[in-house]
């Protein structure tokens, strides 16, 4: 007789403490140099040798198992169907709230995975490039909802992922500038048949409304082979966002070309009040309505504590 609580019996995830997860590293070698951490770390995120050893090396080992299994299945299916397709990349999605540390996780994974043997080609793309230009958002009256699902050019993003998954070459994605807070006209980044593609964005696990006529309506996560959701309590996210806003006020916002240059001369009190207002009006609403509900769709959940350190890991059961 199973005497576990119902929420444990029916939990689709296996949950590991940090210590339990760290032991799963086994003999996975450390391939990053200490000097690389600053380059991989986002502003005010936490990344050190211990975090990589305890969290990211076990994850790298797990992903190597998943990628190898998918490749063997892919080749077996091709043999069964007697077809010769182009190379199909393995796509990993990284999701989570603003200020949670998605970019750091994505960059660390890219660095670790690219040093597997043999050396795979690992590319990284963010969904920021698929936001509508500011002029379009203004025209549609949704500039205050930038980052919400409706602010993305979903057909363009789905077309991009479809081309990548089909193994097409020289697939282009738009470029986004965090300085101007807008799409850069006539600039593109090219993705050319990677072995692994990491796709990072707040809403990459978002689902659409189910059609009444039964027709297939693709969503971004349909193209993912593995997905990571980075989780943290709202109070921590709010604090990290405010801290980041204050740091940007003293750095990037001082650039006259910055979209947020008007905030550069705010006092600490004014900047904090502004950051709280932006958080509550935009980021918190997006988190509660659109981002957090997608957490149960992830393959793996990294739960961070108040100091940006991962405290537990939840892995979806096969």
Swiss-Prot record:
Q: Which GO terms describe its molecular function?
A: ATP binding; pantothenate kinase activity
Provide GO CC annotations from the record: cytoplasm
For this protein, the record's InterPro entries field holds:
P-loop_NTPase, PanK, PRK/URK
The residues that the entry says bind ATP are 96-103
Out of the domains of life, which is the source? Answer: Bacteria
Task: List the cysteine pairs that form cystine.
Answer: none
The UniProt keywords, alphabetically, are: ATP-binding, Coenzyme A biosynthesis, Cytoplasm, Kinase, Nucleotide-binding, Transferase
Keyword set includes Transcription regulation: no
Q: Which CDD domains match?
A: PanK
E.C. number: 2.7.1.33
What is the enzyme's main class?
transferase
The metabolic or biological pathway listed in the UniProt record of this protein is: Cofactor biosynthesis; coenzyme A biosynthesis; CoA from (R)-pantothenate: step 1/5
Q: Which GO terms describe its biological process?
A: coenzyme A biosynthetic process
Q: Which Gene3D superfamilies does this one have?
A: P-loop containing nucleotide triphosphate hydrolases
Q: Which reaction does it catalyse?
A: (R)-pantothenate + ATP = (R)-4'-phosphopantothenate + ADP + H(+)
Places the protein is found:
Cytoplasm
In which broad location class does this protein mainly occur, judging by the first location in its UniProt entry? cytoplasm
Q: Which family does it belong to?
A: Belongs to the prokaryotic pantothenate kinase family.
Q: Which PANTHER family match?
A: URIDINE KINASE
In Swiss-Prot or TrEMBL terms, this protein is called Pantothenate kinase
| Natural source organism | Bradyrhizobium diazoefficiens (strain JCM 10833 / BCRC 13528 / IAM 13628 / NBRC 14792 / USDA 110)
Protein encoded by which gene: coaA
